[in-house]
Amino acid sequence: MSPQTETKASVGFKAGVKDYRLTYYTPEYETLDTDILAAFRVTPQPGVPPEEAGAAVAAESSTGTWTSVWTDGLTSLDRYKGRCYNIEPVAGEENQYICYVAYPLDLFEEGSVTNMFTSIVGNVFGFKALRALRLEDLRIPVAYVKTFQGPPHGIQVERDKLNKYGRPLLGCTIKPKLGLSAKNYGRACYECLRGGLDFTKDDENVNSQPFMRWRDRFLFCAEAIYKSQAETGEIKGHYLNATAGTCEEMIKRAVFARELGVPIVMHDYLTGGFTANTSLSQYCRDNGLLLHIHRAMHAVIDRQKNHGMHFRVLAKALRLSGGDHIHSGTVVGKLEGERDITLGFVDLLRDDYTEKDRSRGIFFTQSWVSTPGVLPVASGGIHVWHMPALTEIFGDDSVLQFGGGTLGHPWGNAPGAVANRVALEACVQARNEGRDLAREGNTIIREAAKWSPELAAACEVWKEIKFEFPAMDTI
């Protein structure tokens, strides 16, 4: 017998395939405060027991592979393996289970969302023994949270920078999203900002196309910001989209924005990637720029109920990677978002501490310790009639963004902005006076419209517009 064979025998190596559950299903395991905990919605293939499916998820997203390997004997699997420690059937669903998996913290590189996701939502999602797999939630331990910078500035610092308190912030996405020249684009920004909005925004598609190169857009938008600030006496901003084909080009655009003295830049964090996003976030913190985050591509990942990843996980990942704003759905507009579920991950974005609450889709209690909060952005198919509901649902720490609801005003961009600002101020005043926005919302808007012809015109245009489809994202 060769020395190598003797060595393998001495560590108890036995070639072949064995059930995952023999190693990775550990219902007796007591989770540690330092474990990353994951809740997976697992749909096994017919004939695969839930214990084997849950153990397979734990194995394939940590130390396991399809067969025994002799190098297992060179390390401590008990220290590094993921463990499926609990399985619950999903009410009302046949052959679907919530499998809870605990991962030791040593499996992950410090300060890297990229590395965390490569393991937890990596190849396991293509595993043949599973019909479908969805990551519903993650518990990020405090020990891991503290390895991240998080948002560049956070909610309070942003309010101090802008000198705006006691109300939601107002924004507008410039439309048409593609095709305008840089000068016309800047003019549209100026009209919206002078009318009363706090921000205007590049659409997520706007990078540096032939019809409008990024440098020209940045210059004309900066002119719009400074001109509107001089006229209104308020601090204004435009989300200059720095997303680019390379990290180097992205940072170059952010540097130019800083040189122009504008307050905020923007990034498409899913299409751009978490490595790029974290790099940009760190640059923004070091150089005093706010960072607006768009979630383009999220519905490819989170829309299906039984496969992919819930947006609350993407929201937590963004808070780690860094961003001061992120789009979160509206509940009342044209884009997906059920109220309790949406408010669940909005709290995960803003609050220091969020209790487990399955009725809102929150599977784990989450502490963010001193990580700054992120402002949720409500955007997509909203207009002045939605203002009471938006104010009541999202509260002051939010950004309400009206694209078509500003630019579609029959009198132009500036009157559209005036209408939104008047509607918002009326709703905030009514709320502060103790009125019920949910019940009296339409009355509040009508009363304000008597004193604002711009608001009255907006009310008339959008009085019949509704987006009433059932939400896909339900418990």
UniProtKB/Swiss-Prot annotation:
Database matches in Pfam families: RuBisCO_large (PF00016), RuBisCO_large_N (PF02788)
Site (Transition state stabilizer): K334
Lineage, opening ranks: Eukaryota, Viridiplantae, Streptophyta, Embryophyta, Tracheophyta
Organism of derivation: Amaranthus tricolor
Post-translational modification: The disulfide bond which can form in the large chain dimeric partners within the hexadecamer appears to be associated with oxidative stress and protein turnover.
Known partners and oligomeric status: Heterohexadecamer of 8 large chains and 8 small chains; disulfide-linked. The disulfide link is formed within the large subunit homodimers.
Protein name per the record: Ribulose bisphosphate carboxylase large chain
Function description: RuBisCO catalyzes two reactions: the carboxylation of D-ribulose 1,5-bisphosphate, the primary event in carbon dioxide fixation, as well as the oxidative fragmentation of the pentose substrate in the photorespiration process. Both reactions occur simultaneously and in competition at the same active site.
Gene Ontology cellular-component annotations: chloroplast
Keywords: Acetylation, Calvin cycle, Carbon dioxide fixation, Chloroplast, Disulfide bond, Lyase, Magnesium, Metal-binding, Methylation, Monooxygenase, Oxidoreductase, Photorespiration, Photosynthesis, Plastid
Residues modified as N-acetylproline: P3
